[in-house]
């Protein structure tokens, strides 16, 4: 009997699929483990270079002036990200908040934001003010900032000719690495570099801005090493390692990071303020563990993609393709299958496993969304979770997995719940 059946009730045909998937995935697991090892050594070197000490994890209160722990963490982030400077703060509430702070820090009235990889993720629509969303609440467009887009081509690749036409009038070129609610693979660093080169060829002063959410540590380099001036991400995704309880980061050119710090705090204050309270240890430890945790999440993705192919689905990316973020998307086919898959993930979660997810309205989203996340950190997507909008073709987005052993059990239960009901 499979070890899995000592703890969960799987059907024989589902266990047979598990065995086949594990066999097929082994060479792709090894590729990801090589990336993990490289990134972990890079991380270790950055910690050593910074001479971080145990007292740097104690935290500060009040203004947070002269916080050496905060400064060293930002130095480590900058080195690992291939950046000049970084802003790493628990005051960032989410990825969307971090992105908003960065965009407001860079753009002024009359400037143009060019979305070079098509319309951004749903939650940014309200930040920008697209289609009148958030009008009057202080969106970019409320402040006289213009928005332009270069839609992706039919094959979900950037339209480089259109980018070249639109970039001369733009202040910031926005690249979204991950897919949002599109059925495309995340962009690799070569694509990011080509978008950056295309925009700079016609506008040398344009700021290349990359939403790096879900993409950290999936390759051996980061977007700042592929032409980005500024990258932004969330600590409850990849770089927090499942340990950081909140926060976000902005990394890149020193002058641009400083502008973002003025926006987060206040003009004249910049990076000098921001107490860390009791968060430094978790942020240090989470970032240190992040390369290994991301590897576990991608191994989970590879396994899930293989398993889904074996039941006739067409996940993006395929298990045998390059992985540039931790997300897998596939068409569940029906609302029942989408709901069943999410409930299976929830049932094999360490937290709130007894809950049964239901579709519901979510702020920033057009359709009802169903979400499964039995995570230790609310909203964490480096922990095994899945979600999808209740609209045809009922696409499911699966991400995360702190360790492969537990995540494998969750994915297998989700597939059984969606496609092997009695």
Indicate residue ranges for each PLM-predicted region:
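Extended, compositionally biased flexible segments
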Residues: 71, 77-82, 90-91
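N-terminal small-domain helix-loop-helix segment of the aminotransferase-like
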Residues: 63-69
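Conserved PLP-enzyme active-site core in the AAT-like
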Residues: 4-26, 33, 42-56, 65, ...
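Short glycine-rich or small-residue beta-strand-to-loop segments that form or flank ligand, phosphate
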Residues: 60, 87-90, 326-331
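Conserved C-terminal alpha-helix-loop-beta "cap" of PLP-dependent enzymes
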Residues: 309-421
């Amino acid at each position: 009997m499979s070890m899995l059946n000592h703890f969960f009730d799987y059907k024989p045909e589902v266990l047979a699929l598990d065995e086949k998937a594990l066999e097929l995935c082994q060479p792709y697991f090894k590729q990801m483990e090589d990336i993990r090892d490289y990134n972990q050594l890079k991380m270790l070197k950055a910690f050593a270079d910074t001479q971080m000490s145990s007292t740097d994890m104690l935290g500060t209160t009040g203004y947070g002036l002269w916080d050496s722990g905060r400064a060293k963490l930002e130095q480590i982030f900058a080195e690992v990200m291939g950046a000049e400077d970084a802003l790493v703060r628990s005051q960032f509430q989410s990825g969307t908040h971090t992105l908003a702070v960065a965009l407001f820090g860079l753009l002024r009235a009359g400037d143009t934001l060019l979305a070079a990889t098509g319309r951004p993720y749903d939650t940014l629509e309200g930040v920008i003010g697209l289609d009148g969303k958030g009008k009057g609440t202080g969106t970019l467009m409320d402040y006289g900032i213009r928005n332009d887009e270069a839609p992706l081509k039919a094959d979900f690749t950037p339209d480089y000719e259109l980018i070249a036409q639109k970039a001369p009038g733009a202040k910031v070129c926005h690249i979204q690495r991950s897919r949002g609610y599109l059925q495309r693979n995340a962009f690799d660093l070569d694509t990011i570099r080509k978008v950056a080169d295309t925009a700079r060829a016609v506008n040398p002063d344009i700021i290349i801005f990359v939403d790096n959410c879900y993409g950290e540590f999936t390759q051996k380099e980061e977007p700042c090493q592929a032409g980005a001036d500024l990258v932004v991400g969330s600590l409850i995704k990849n770089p927090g390692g499942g340990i950081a309880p909140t926060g976000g980061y902005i990394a890149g050119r020193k002058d641009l990071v400083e502008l973002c710090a003025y926006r987060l705090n206040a003009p004249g204050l910049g990076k000098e303020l921001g107490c860390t309270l009791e968060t430094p240890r978790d942020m240090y430890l989470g970032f240190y563990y992040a390369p290994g945790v991301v590897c576990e999440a991608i191994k989970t993705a590879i396994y899930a993609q293989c398993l889904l192919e074996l039941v006739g689905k067409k996940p993006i990316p395929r298990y045998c393709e390059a992985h540039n973020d931790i997300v897998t998307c596939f068409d569940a086919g029906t609302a029942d299958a989408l709901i069943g898959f999410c409930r299976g993930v929830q049932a094999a979660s360490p937290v709130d496993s007894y809950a049964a997810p239901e579709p519901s309205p979510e702020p920033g989203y057009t359709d009802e969304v169903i979400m499964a996340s039995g995570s230790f950190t609310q909203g964490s997507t480096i922990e095994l979770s899945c979600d999808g909008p209740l609209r045809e073709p009922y696409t499911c987005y699966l991400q995360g997995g702190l360790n492969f052993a537990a995540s494998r059990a969750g994915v297998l239960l989700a597939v059984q719940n969606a496609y092997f009901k009695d």
